[in-house]
Amino acid sequence: MFRGATLVNLDSKGRLSVPTRYREQLLENAAGQMVCTIDIYHPCLLLYPLPEWEIIEQKLSRLSSMNPVERRVQRLLLGHASECQMDGAGRLLIAPVLRQHAGLTKEVMLVGQFNKFELWDETTWHQQVKEDIDAEQLATGDLSERLQDLSL
């Protein structure tokens, strides 16, 4: 399980160094093989260990190519999916087209989200967090049943 937000740097070749606390888990569970794709709802990337991505691919394969919405989701997620192998130094190369989509330059937030990571431009991440907090403070209390059961 991945959790927390960590500031990492992209080098001049577009590689990011995976924090040490995740490396062993990624090597053990995915042999360092990852898949990166775009988030179709936010200006960030989604980074999955290969076994987790294969579950997503199975679900995508069950969607209908005759349904325009389902086909669009398939096209966006699969069409942007890029395999990346963690190297011996614990780095992942993020494809240029993906970096461009998320506006990633040098400072990147690696955000753990259970079975995957999100990759955000640092400034965009902080803006998103502020927007999310502001939205929650303005919320009228219409919580889903699952959120009503969540006690912090």
From Swiss-Prot:
Q: What is seen without this gene? A: Mutants have no detectable phenotype under standard laboratory conditions. They are more resistant to trimethoprim than wild-type cells.
Residue ranges of domain SpoVT-AbrB in the record: 5-52, 81-124
Task: Name the GO cellular-component terms.
Answer: cytoplasm; nucleoid
Q: Which residues cross the membrane?
A: none
Q: Which UniProt keywords apply?
A: Cytoplasm, DNA-binding, Repeat, Repressor, Transcription, Transcription regulation
Any one biological process term the GO annotation gives: negative regulation of DNA-templated transcription initiation
Source taxon at top rank:
Bacteria
GO MF term list: DNA-binding transcription factor activity; sequence-specific DNA binding; transcription cis-regulatory region binding
Where does it mainly reside?
cytoplasm
Task: Report further notes.
Answer: Overproduction is lethal and perturbs cell division. It destabilizes the divisome, but does not affect FtsZ levels or prevent Z ring assembly. Co-overproduction of RsmH (MraW) protects the cell from the toxic effects of MraZ overproduction.
Matches recorded under NCBIfam families:
division/cell wall cluster transcriptional repressor MraZ
Q: What job does this protein perform?
A: Negatively regulates its own expression and that of the subsequent genes in the proximal part of the division and cell wall (dcw) gene cluster. Acts by binding directly to DNA. May also regulate the expression of genes outside the dcw cluster.
Instruction: Describe its assembly.
Output: Dodecamer.
Instruction: Say which family it is in.
Output: Belongs to the MraZ family.
Q: What is this protein called?
A: Transcriptional regulator MraZ
**Annotated source species:** Escherichia coli (strain K12)
